[in-house]
UniProtKB/Swiss-Prot annotation:
It holds the Pfam family Oxidored_q2. It comes from Mystacina tuberculata. This is NADH-ubiquinone oxidoreductase chain 4L. Its EC number is 7.1.1.2. Core subunit of the mitochondrial membrane respiratory chain NADH dehydrogenase (Complex I) which catalyzes electron transfer from NADH through the respiratory chain, using ubiquinone as an electron acceptor. Part of the enzyme membrane arm which is embedded in the lipid bilayer and involved in proton translocation.
Length: 98
């Protein structure tokens, strides 16, 4: 495994650790999710470029589209929770149930 792959894997693990440790605020959780998606995007792109898989060349773009949708939904939920309750605590999401 090359040094580039190791660095991207370390970035993914650090983002995952941040997501698991700092779960109190929604904004920090969203930033950690974006870090995970970015490192996953770079890893998939480099893997496809190194293996010359032409059939899977659309995979990074599809992953990027899903990351953008996840970010948009997360920010919409963050705005809704912060407007309703005034804080962005993740524990307030339990109050949104019908």
């Amino acid at each position: 495994m090359s040094l580039t792959y190791m660095n991207i894997l370390v970035a993914f693990v650090i983002s995952l650790t941040g997501l698991l440790m700092y779960r109190s605020h929604m904004m920090s959780s969203l930033l950690c999710l974006e870090g995970m998606m970015l490192s996953l995007f770079v890893m998939v792109t480099i893997t496809i470029l190194n293996t010359h898989l032409t059939l899977a060349s659309m995979m990074p773009i599809i992953l990027l589209v899903f990351a953008a949708c996840e970010a948009a939904l997360g920010l919409a939920l963050l705005v809704m929770v912060s407007n309703t309750y005034g804080v962005d605590y993740v524990q307030n999401l339990n109050l949104l149930q019908c």
